[in-house]
Design a protein with these regions (language model features):
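Extended, low-polarity transmembrane helix blocks
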Residues: 1-33, 39, 47-53, 57, ...
Length: 129
């Protein structure tokens, strides 16, 4: 039974990467193009806007699985910085400081630094060529 389940691991790794990539890419899209429902709209050229551009570009690379380890490393650092700069000063506990997404995504991205993109990715296609 376990072997049957383990056979799905590579594909599920790619599915996880795509799902997380869509989330981080959408964060960047919302900050850059100001189309989200929230009230936070960073001014063009401000630090939050630049970080949104970073989320947009690295999020897209992560989403499609191109240079995944590099994009994941950069995004992991970005999420760690976001947590410690924006959330940690409010409280040490993520449920109290609103930093759950940043904390979890930091470690998800760190995992992809070691695992790579998975079989459904540009990286996998380039490695076969």
């Amino acid at each position: 039974m376990v072997n049957k389940i383990q056979a799905y691991q590579p594909v599920l790794l790619s599915i996880l990467r795509i799902a997380v990539g869509l989330v981080i890419f959408s964060f960047g899209m919302a900050k850059i193009f100001h189309f989200h429902a929230g009230t936070f709209m960073p001014p063009t050229g401000s630090l939050p806007w630049i970080l949104g551009l970073f989320e947009l570009v690295c999020g897209f690379l992560f989403l499609v699985g191109f240079q995944t380890r590099i994009a994941a490393f950069l995004l992991s650092g970005l999420m760690a910085a976001a947590y410690f700069i924006s959330h940690f000063p409010k409280s040490i506990f993520p449920p109290e400081n609103g930093g759950m997404a940043a904390a979890v995504l930091c470690f998800v991205f760190l995992y992809f630094v070691t695992s790579g993109a998975g079989p459904i990715s540009v990286d996998a296609k380039l490695n076969k060529a």
